[in-house]
Curated annotation (Swiss-Prot):
Residues 6-94 form the ASCH domain. It comes from Salmonella typhimurium (strain LT2 / SGSC1412 / ATCC 700720). The gene is yqfB. One of its GO terms (cellular component) is cytosol. It catalyses: N(4)-acetylcytidine + H2O = cytidine + acetate + H(+); N(4)-acetyl-2'-deoxycytidine + H2O = 2'-deoxycytidine + acetate + H(+); N(4)-acetylcytosine + H2O = cytosine + acetate + H(+). It comes from the Bacteria. Belongs to the N(4)-acetylcytidine amidohydrolase family. This is N(4)-acetylcytidine amidohydrolase. Catalyzes the hydrolysis of N(4)-acetylcytidine (ac4C). The keyword Hydrolase applies. One of its GO terms (molecular function) is N4-acetylcytidine amidohydrolase activity. The keyword Cell membrane does not apply.
Length: 103
């Protein structure tokens, strides 16, 4: 079995598959992805494969510059997005936005 290239929490799987979640916000450890990359996607909890995505763009963002567009692309409110990012990446302020589409 091939390894997954990127993982998402299981709670995001349905939104990704339905096209409601079209970005992911990551820390520096996952800043190497670039437009055109095709990635196998798995669940964080069990590493089970659930789809393949293509990276369509990348950019940088800080917690303070997250906006309503980011929230819409994550399929959540801006307050919820900021809370989730702060929980996943405590004490960090610089992040990398990975735009993607399911293949």
């Amino acid at each position: 079995m091939q390894p997954n290239d990127i993982t998402f929490f299981q709670r995001f799987q349905n939104d990704i598959l339905a096209g409601r979640k079209t970005i992911t916000i990551r820390d520096a450890s996952e800043s190497h992805f670039k437009a055109g990359d095709v990635l196998r996607v798995g669940r964080f909890e069990d590493d089970g494969y659930f789809c393949t995505i293509e990276v369509t763009g990348t950019s940088t963002v800080t917690l303070d510059t997250l906006n309503e567009k980011h929230a819409q692309q994550e399929n959540m409110s801006l307050d919820e997005l900021k809370r989730v990012i702060a929980e996943i990446y405590p004490n960090q302020t610089q992040f990398y936005v990975i735009d993607f589409k399911c293949l």
